[in-house]
From Swiss-Prot:
Heterodimer of an alpha and a beta chain. One of its GO terms (cellular component) is cytosol. One of its GO terms (biological process) is positive regulation of metabolic process. The keyword Protein biosynthesis does not apply. SUPFAM superfamilies: IHF-like DNA-binding proteins. Residues 59-80 are annotated as: Disordered. Pfam families: Bac_DNA_binding (PF00216). Keywords: DNA recombination, DNA-binding, Transcription, Transcription regulation, Translation regulation. This protein is one of the two subunits of integration host factor, a specific DNA-binding protein that functions in genetic recombination as well as in transcriptional and translational control. It comes from Bordetella parapertussis (strain 12822 / ATCC BAA-587 / NCTC 13253). Transmembrane segments: none annotated. Gene3D superfamilies: IHF-like DNA-binding proteins. Belongs to the bacterial histone-like protein family. This is Integration host factor subunit alpha.
Length: 113
């Protein structure tokens, strides 16, 4: 193990996104919260319908149907069926990948326009 200490990564929450809209765009706090909530509700609803969601410069969310398959109980070795299910996948855009690859300085919010 190295002696380099890395900062604990932060988690950006919906409440913090609303606060950022309040600070940067000038919306009141209620409007900012409503916009963030509506944004994520629309994404959730589209995915629930089986639609894809494409956010230019960010990435694509898609729903995939996974077929049933045999699995194995790791304790007993017994074969058990794993049911079919739907999963959400995310593929980052090239733009997002290139920003994430260079974590030394946060991106300038003005350059995202």
């Amino acid at each position: 193990m190295g002696t380099t200490m890395l900062a604990e990564p932060r988690t950006l929450t919906k409440a913090e996104l609303a606060e950022l809209l309040f600070e940067r765009v000038g919306l009141n706090k209620r409007e900012a919260k409503d916009i963030v909530d509506t944004f994520f509700e629309e994404i959730r609803d589209a995915l629930a319908r089986g639609d894809s969601v494409k956010l230019s410069g960010f990435g694509n969310f898609q729903v995939r149907d996974k077929p049933p398959r045999p699995g194995r109980n790791p304790k007993t070795g017994e074969t058990i069926p794993i049911a079919a299910r739907r999963v959400v996948t995310f593929h980052a855009s090239q733009k997002l990948k290139s920003v994430v690859e260079q974590p030394s300085s946060p991106p300038d919010p003005a350059s995202a326009e």
